[in-house]
Swiss-Prot record:
Organism in which the protein naturally occurs: Sulfurihydrogenibium sp. (strain YO3AOP1)
Protein name: Enolase
Organism classification: Bacteria, Pseudomonadati, Aquificota, Aquificia, Aquificales
Active site positions: 205 (proton donor), 335 (proton acceptor)
Function: Catalyzes the reversible conversion of 2-phosphoglycerate (2-PG) into phosphoenolpyruvate (PEP). It is essential for the degradation of carbohydrates via glycolysis.
Binding site for Mg(2+): 242, 283, 310
Cofactor note text: Binds a second Mg(2+) ion via substrate during catalysis.
Listed GO MF terms: magnesium ion binding; phosphopyruvate hydratase activity
Subcellular location: Cytoplasm; Secreted; Cell surface
Keyword entries, A-Z: Cytoplasm, Glycolysis, Lyase, Magnesium, Metal-binding, Secreted
A Gene Ontology biological process term: glycolytic process
EC assignment: 4.2.1.11
Family as reported in the entry's similarity comment: Belongs to the enolase family.
Length: 428
């Protein structure tokens, strides 16, 4: 009864008001399920290709009618009659039909939407929660949230070079209580910013984008907010950074806070930050093509903090494998739309796990009401999730889904808190 009888694509809007792709899978049993794909603002050079129309008369060239048409014709023709529960085959058929390294023929947005819709339909067909269908009986770890509360870089119109300043609540013994600590700190941060005369408008991911000039200012604001909210920095709540440094890397130099820095200079900067603030995680600390610098960064800080590859790895198992071989980074950011199928995403997570790298399930800056990544985080026992701040429904939807999952799991639910980072210096 899990035979696919129809696949439908449509153009919908993401949280930035840009078109994106939704796919619906219809099974013989009558089950109907849909999935919406996200879209990123700062993208890695090796990401799978998001197919856009380029017609300036529609949505300023950002329409996705070609991708939708590919779903309604080529992909539908390919998958109708297939068994939805054979996810590996479903994804392989689409990859082979596309025939390109970066899914530029059918579009990664078309392929991924169908991949996720089929998985969701199969879970409903089997009368299982999505996390249970994807992860089996052992899916029970709720993730520590990395909450992006101050925005800079490509996500904001201020002078901060680093893209994200995150709070990482690890206290409370449960996801719900840790989330509460993060939310309370977010609200206190708002009042701290207001008191100091800064704007409290929120950016794409629900964080604030105040007109701060220096990294130190942003970190000091976080420390103050954590403390004023009644929590202990470095005990209850840690700090995480996404430098997104490929965005300010040019001609072999990093243009950071109006200075030209080398890779070694950046490493010294991070050592100073880690020595001064309770920073537990640094994402894309160096540029995606600066592999020599990454080796040195990993050597310098790899046993102290989580060094996350996002643009560096683009959720691509081949690139992750190469990075592991070269002792680069110690953590992988997982974004479904960077690679473009559920199967390849699960492969990337597994590759991280068997090589003792942590995996962080992540949203994109252009999101939707779709909560697939919340279930994926629990399904894979990843232990960490990045899905924005404590405002904007497109971000909060994921947190609410995780609250539901934790409640459903009851006493079987595990929240690791600080132990999610046990391989680093904050081991209990």
């Amino acid at each position: 009864m899990s035979t696919i009888i129809d696949i439908i694509g449509r153009e919908v809007l993401d949280s930035r008001g840009n078109p994106t792709v939704e796919a619906t899978a219809v099974l013989e049993s009558g089950v109907v399920a849909s999935a919406i794909v996200p879209s990123g603002a700062s993208t890695g050079a090796n990401e799978a290709l998001e197919l856009r129309d380029g017609d300036k008369k529609r949505f300023l060239g950002k329409g996705v009618l070609k991708a939708v048409e590919n779903i309604n014709t080529k992909i539908a023709d390919l998958l109708i009659g297939e068994e939805s529960e054979d996810q590996v085959r479903i994804d392989r058929l689409m990859i082979e039909a596309d025939g390109t390294e970066n899914k530029s023929n059918l579009g990664a947005n078309a392929i991924l939407a169908v991949s996720l819709a089929v998985a969701r339909a199969t879970a409903i067909e089997k009368e299982m929660p999505l996390y249970r269908y994807l992860g089996g009986v052992n899916a029970k770890v709720l993730p520590v949230p990395l909450m992006n509360v101050i925005n800079g870089g490509a996500h904001a119109d201020n002078e901060l070079d680093f893209q994200e300043f995150m709070i990482v609540p690890v206290c409370g013994g449960s996801f719900k209580e840790a989330l509460r600590a993060g939310v309370e700190t977010f609200h206190v941060l708002k009042s701290v910013l207001k008191e100091k005369g800064y704007s409290t408008n929120v950016g794409d991911e629900g964080g604030f984008a105040p007109a701060l000039r220096e990294t130190k200012e942003a970190l000091d604001m976080l420390m103050l907010a954590i403390d004023k909210a009644g929590y202990t920095p470095g005990e209850d709540i840690f700090i995480a950074l996404d430098a997104a440094s490929s965005e300010f890397y040019k001609d072999g130099k990093y243009l950071f806070e109006k200075r030209e820095l080398t890779s070694d200079d950046m490493i010294i900067l991070y050592e100073e930050i880690v020595g001064t603030y309770p920073v537990i995680s640094i994402e894309d600390g160096l540029a995606e093509n600066d592999w020599e610098g990454w080796k040195n960064l990993t050597q310098a800080l790899g046993n102290k903090v989580q060094l996350v590859g996002d643009d560096l790895f683009t959720t691509n198992p081949k690139i992750i494998k190469e990075g592991i071989k070269n002792n680069i980074a110690n953590s992988v950011l997982i974004k479904l739309n960077q690679i473009g199928t559920l199967t390849e995403t699960l492969d990337a997570i597994e590759m991280a796990r068997i090589n003792n790298y942590t995996a962080i399930i992540s949203h994109r800056s252009g999101e939707s009401e779709d909560t697939f990544i919340a279930d994926l985080a629990v399904a894979t026992n990843a232990g960490q999730i990045k899905t924005g701040s404590a405002s904007r429904t497109d971000r909060v939807a994921k947190y609410n889904q995780l609250i539901r999952i934790e409640e459903e799991l009851g006493e079987n639910a595990i929240f690791k808190g600080k132990q999610a980072f046990k391989k680093f210096q904050f081991e209990e």
